[in-house]
Amino acid sequence: GMIHRDGGPAIEWADGGKSWYKNGKLHREDGPAFERCNGDKEWYKSGGLHREEGPAVECVCGYKEWWSNDKRYGKNNDFNNESWQVFIKTLIFS
């Protein structure tokens, strides 16, 4: 069957990483869907990298990537959380 779990990670890796799945796709509404053991985090919606509040990829080293609907629009300081939210609204309403 499809990997799926409501209310917690569907996979808890031996190294301490965690993955949230819904209907077989990486997905989480209220946080990163993939938390690596080193602290790196990735936000997914229905299997694609996506985050409206900030970067969809946040690495402990400080590296960031800005994604919407599985398309990368920037990295690191191309946006900050405020400018990203403004940009996302222009994408949605264009």
Residue ranges and their predicted role:
Residues 2-94:
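Glycine/tyrosine- and acidic-biased, solvent-exposed loop/turn segments at the edges of beta-strands
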